[in-house]
Amino acid sequence: MTNSNLRTENHFDYVKIKLASPERVMEWGQRTLPNGQVVGEVTKPETINYRTLKPEMDGLFCEKIFGPSKDWECHCGKYKRVRHRGIVCERCGVEVTESRVRRHRMGFIKLAAPVSHVWYLKGIPSYVAILLDMPLRDVEQIVYFNCYVVLDIGDSKDLKYKQLLTEDEWLEIEDEIYAEDSTIENEPIVGIGAEALKQLLEDLNLKEVAEQLREDIATSKGQKRAKLIKRLRVIDNFIATSASPEWMVLDAIPVIPPDLRPMVQLDGGRFATSDLNDLYRRVINRNNRLARLQEILAPEIIVRNEKRMLQEAVDALIDNGRRGRTVVGANNRPLKSLSDIIEGKQGRFRQNLLGKRVDYSGRSVIVVGPKLKMHQCGLPKEMAIELFQPFVIHRLIRQNIVNNIKAAKKLIQKADDEVMQVLQEVIEGHPILLNRAPTLHRLGIQAFEPKLVAGRAIQLHPLVCPAFNADFDGDQMAVHVPLAIEAQTEARMLMLASNNILSPATGDPIVTPSQDMVLGSYYLTAIQPQSKQPKFGDYSNTYASLEDVLQALEDKRIDLHDWVWVRFSGEIEDDDELQNPLKSETLKDGTRIEEWTYRRDRLDEDGSLISRYILTTVGRVVMNHTIIDAVAATS
């Protein structure tokens, strides 16, 4: 974030997400009070006192750490009122401030033993396994206390660095090391759990490993080369972000603000609480128990079991169910972990950040609009008047049709002709955005020029359907109105449907006729076997131009699949063109008439075409005439 302004929350350049160091995690939650006391560490699993219903000190809802639960009031009640703003109570240590600080002040839990972060260990791909160049199964055996790993071989010739040892194998090696006739001076060092993992990650010199990998990639090929490139890419990213691999092992856990995991009193005097509080409580209980066991120098097997339980508690807090048994609450419902809150359709991003309700938007069912141009869409009047209401009110007042906003709203409710006229002026040249969920690529949102239509359905040009993956069996689309001039310009220049002909993914045309259009084109040009072909010279079925045929169709004198003879001077493609005519006759004036299967040509003495009649169906005339018109309009 830029430091140019004190109100940094409104002035920042970009948001960067990267690994946090243990110091950074503690920095988020730690604060020094004016009396020099450092607060921020949550050490007790309690939430609120069952008698006073006030938060317990140093617990998950502690007022000293997170701020007061009532505005301008400390925990013990010595200071009340806004005039004591900023004072820290000398009795309870709570700062007198607004209660809303409990929505952003964080705490932390200092862990008695390091634990691995489940995202980096069990994610796909597993970054810990890639960095250490070890199989994921082996890394899991270390973290969950099933196997030892060799951290330093010492003087032993039989051991290898990063070799896995079972309990029995390590006991045998220990017996050899401590035997009376042992010649080993430097003992091999082994480790187990997340501490061993942290040591392995600390021992990595990223720059040296990256250099070595580049040399190996140059000489290797196939599957091995792909694996090396994968590892190098991860290492380069760590170097680029100045992150240390050992940060993937946690020494401290952030505790999110209490108002984001609230505890609410219900009518019967019972409490409803967020699942996160239960998950945090498990972590704190196990952490405190582990610290106590280490303090009293408990047997290693008990301490190790407690460390494994702490690792599982932290795994459940970060991503419940990712590994091992899912932690369940009352009535066997899995508890919602931090990952569950963030991810998925109901998660924080898709539901609350991207899926926000926005002003100047609406949604309706889509129907086909065959008379629309490709860059147009039909917008129901009812919807348009609601979406463009501020613009309409502004124009009504400016044109002195009404004097104030209240009168304008009344006029709009009546759906007066004047209002519709003004609405028409407002939407002229004002593009709107149409979006169909799910928006899987950028063509899921496109801009259109609105045309007012009756009814309550949005009309859409059939050619833009493939881009939206839309069909007309009840699909709904959302409408958004770009307000700023810049947004309108961008919509018109970049997002207009007629500018998005090619798919951004493949470069192939995405605007292709499909479904109804293909069926319509086929039906239009199809030949019906029962339709009789008229003889040449049958004046009731002979027309002077394509326009005459269209006029006759409009007047219902002929049907789409009727055969007609029509004069046509353009280029034609005929199956029997390469063969000789069926019949050729020279007239007295020197001109020649050639009979072909589907045409009659009259040629002069030099062989130049004088006139041509072709035998075709009315539907094909319609198709041909439409294409000629469209090509002529664009050229």
From Swiss-Prot:
The reaction(s) this protein catalyses: RNA(n) + a ribonucleoside 5'-triphosphate = RNA(n+1) + diphosphate
Keyword line: DNA-directed RNA polymerase, Magnesium, Metal-binding, Nucleotidyltransferase, Transcription, Transferase, Zinc
InterPro entries: DNA-dir_RpoC1_gamma, DNA-dir_RpoC_beta_prime, RNA_pol_asu, RNA_pol_N, RNA_pol_Rpb1_1, RNA_pol_Rpb1_3, RNA_pol_Rpb1_3_sf, RNA_pol_Rpb1_clamp_domain
Pfam families cross-referenced by the UniProt entry: RNA_pol_Rpb1_1 (PF04997), RNA_pol_Rpb1_2 (PF00623), RNA_pol_Rpb1_3 (PF04983)
Binding site for Zn(2+): C74, C76, C89, C92
Single Gene Ontology MF annotation: magnesium ion binding
Co-factor binding comment: Binds 1 Mg(2+) ion per subunit. Binds 1 Zn(2+) ion per subunit.
Cofactor(s) needed: Mg(2+); Zn(2+)
SUPFAM superfamilies per record: beta and beta-prime subunits of DNA dependent RNA-polymerase (SSF64484)
Any one cellular-component term (Gene Ontology): DNA-directed RNA polymerase complex
Entry similarity comment: Belongs to the RNA polymerase beta' chain family. RpoC1 subfamily.
Protein name: DNA-directed RNA polymerase subunit gamma
Organism taxonomic ancestry: Bacteria, Bacillati, Cyanobacteriota, Cyanophyceae, Synechococcales
The encoding gene: rpoC1
